[in-house]
Amino acid sequence: MSITLSDSAAARVSSFLENRGKGYGLRLGVRTSGCSGMAYVLEFVDEPATDDTVFEDKGVKVVIDGKSLQFLDGTQLDFVKEGLNEGFKFTNPNVKDECGCGESFHV
């Protein structure tokens, strides 16, 4: 099982954590949402819970709760700039379908 970050995603997360002044790492998870059923959740984590799994890639700790892990295994997180827009992009091999707006997915 693994989660990987591109160089640009690792740099962006590291910058956010440095500007925040504290934090253990980045929590990556899923929640029920949207027309396809699931959406990604990104938030800072100051301390992992006992049932969390922690991955480290390029110096960044990525924390995933036990329920989300099965849906996120093998995911790569990237940070992209497209025109005036920028944001995190997920490449998840478990996704079977996405909604038209790209806000949610189904596994």
UniProtKB/Swiss-Prot annotation:
Q: Which InterPro entries match?
A: Fe-S_cluster_asmbl/transfer, FeS_biogenesis, FeS_cluster_insertion, FeS_cluster_insertion_CS, HesB-like_dom_sf, IscA_proteobacteria
Q: Please give one Pfam family short name.
A: Fe-S_biosyn
**Alphabetized SUPFAM superfamilies for the sequence:** HesB-like domain
- Superkingdom: Bacteria
GO terms under biological process: iron-sulfur cluster assembly
- What does the record say about how the cofactor binds? Binds 2 iron ions per dimer. The dimer may bind additional iron ions.
MF terms per GO, please? 2 iron, 2 sulfur cluster binding; iron ion binding
- Assembly description: Homodimer; may form tetramers and higher multimers.
The function of this protein is: Is able to transfer iron-sulfur clusters to apo-ferredoxin. Multiple cycles of [2Fe2S] cluster formation and transfer are observed, suggesting that IscA acts catalytically. Recruits intracellular free iron so as to provide iron for the assembly of transient iron-sulfur cluster in IscU in the presence of IscS, L-cysteine and the thioredoxin reductase system TrxA/TrxB.
- Can you name this protein? Iron-binding protein IscA
Please name the source species. Enterobacter sp. (strain 638)
Phylogenetic placement of the source organism: Bacteria, Pseudomonadati, Pseudomonadota, Gammaproteobacteria, Enterobacterales
- The coding gene here is iscA
